[in-house]
From Swiss-Prot:
PANTHER family (alphabetical): MITOCHONDRIAL RIBOSOME RECYCLING FACTOR PSEUDO 1 (PTHR20982:SF3), RIBOSOME RECYCLING FACTOR (PTHR20982)
First-listed, main subcellular location of the protein, grouped into a coarse class: cytoplasm
UniProt xrefs under Pfam families: RRF (PF01765)
Keyword Cytoplasm tagged: yes
Any single GO CC term annotated in Swiss-Prot or TrEMBL for this entry: cytoplasm
Protein source organism: Pseudothermotoga lettingae (strain ATCC BAA-301 / DSM 14385 / NBRC 107922 / TMO) (Thermotoga lettingae)
Subcellular location: Cytoplasm
Protein name, per record: Ribosome-recycling factor
Magnesium found in the keyword field: no
GO BP field: translational termination
Single GO MF annotation: ribosomal large subunit binding
Source species, domain of life: Bacteria
Role of this protein: Responsible for the release of ribosomes from messenger RNA at the termination of protein biosynthesis. May increase the efficiency of translation by recycling ribosomes from one round of translation to another.
Entry keyword set: Cytoplasm, Protein biosynthesis
Length: 185
């Protein structure tokens, strides 16, 4: 049976990996993805509403996203929200839909995005190591208090280290996949 500290560490590490995965997924790459619009909120009748709740977002073959709101009165609000975001894209409003064209990124831009992806991954690794440190500190306290034998402490330490290594490897794989996606022309 797994020790509760190992279970706690695994739950916390899984959440950290999921958060990093989500951050990387939302990052802009050279190709259009509806995920980059998830953080943009539109003022809709006084409420900050995600674009995905106001419109359908489709990808076209020519490196563009088409945003088609269900209520055309919200077109200008969506356009303003995209302008105000830090995406660096210029929305084109034709009265029915908003078109976001993704220019082919320069090598310099791709390198900048890859660097940002590495920073995000490194934050995730630091979070994993901090979780390990906290759990091991708790484990040492339990051993000192006599709740856990020294043999069990060593076994649990090894389990936590193996778990840490596994989660850091997961983050490395997520980063590798994202870097490949970024550098693809």
């Amino acid at each position: 049976m797994r020790h509760p500290l190992v279970k706690n560490a695994e739950d916390r590490m899984n959440k950290a990996v999921e958060k990093i995965s989500e951050e990387l997924r939302k990052m802009r790459t050279g190709r259009p993805s509806p995920a980059i619009l998830e953080e943009i909120k539109v003022d809709y009748y006084g409420a900050q509403t995600p674009i995905s709740q106001l419109a359908t977002v489709n990808i076209t073959e020519d490196r563009a996203l088409i945003i088609k709101p269900w209520d055309r009165s919200v077109l200008s609000s969506i356009e303003k929200a995209i302008f105000a975001s830090d995406l660096g894209l210029t929305p084109q409003n034709d009265g029915n839909v908003i078109r976001l064209t993704f220019p082919t990124p320069t090598t310099e831009q791709r390198q900048k995005w890859a660097k940002k992806a590495k920073e995000i991954a490194e934050q995730g690794k630091i979070a994993i190591r901090n979780i390990r440190r906290d759990i091991l500190k708790e484990l040492k306290g339990d051993t000192k208090d006599g709740k856990i034998s020294e043999d069990d402490e060593k076994r649990i330490e090894k389990e936590i280290q193996d778990l840490t290594d596994k989660k850091i490897l997961e983050i490395d794989k997520l980063l590798e996949k994202k870097e490949k996606e970024i550098m693809e022309v």
